[in-house]
Amino acid sequence: MTMHEALRVRLTETMGPVTFEVLAPHLERDAVVIVAPKLALLEAAIAVAEDESELVDGWIQSGTFRKPSAAERARWKEQMGREWICVVVQPFVLVQDPPTDSDATSFG
């Protein structure tokens, strides 16, 4: 198994749902990054882990990979039951809204 394949397996195994309570300490240290639904969360995590800076910079420039705004953070705090799909790529915590039935095949 190549290093890339091993990374993919490790990240897949650690990816899962989280609530605001779990995200809160990471929000406090400004480590949470929102991955837009049009990007596969796993592919974004791999790009960060493998330091694909040009690719990630493009996502940042397009707004598909960004920090949550103050308004989003406040809204999230009020939505205690809400869940996101999350994967940790130190020092970042990447989050994405769970896929809906219509786009479940494009997730991960």
Model-derived regions: residue spans:
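Generic secondary-structure microfeatures
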Residues: 37-39, 60-64, 91-93
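Short, hydrophobic/π-rich interface segment
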Residues: 43-76
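N-terminal, charge-rich interaction modules
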Residues: 1-50
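Short, compact, well-ordered microdomains
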Residues: 67-108
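Acidic-enriched, low-complexity/disordered segments with a strong bias for Aspartate over Glutamate
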Residues: 28-30, 51, 57, 97, ...
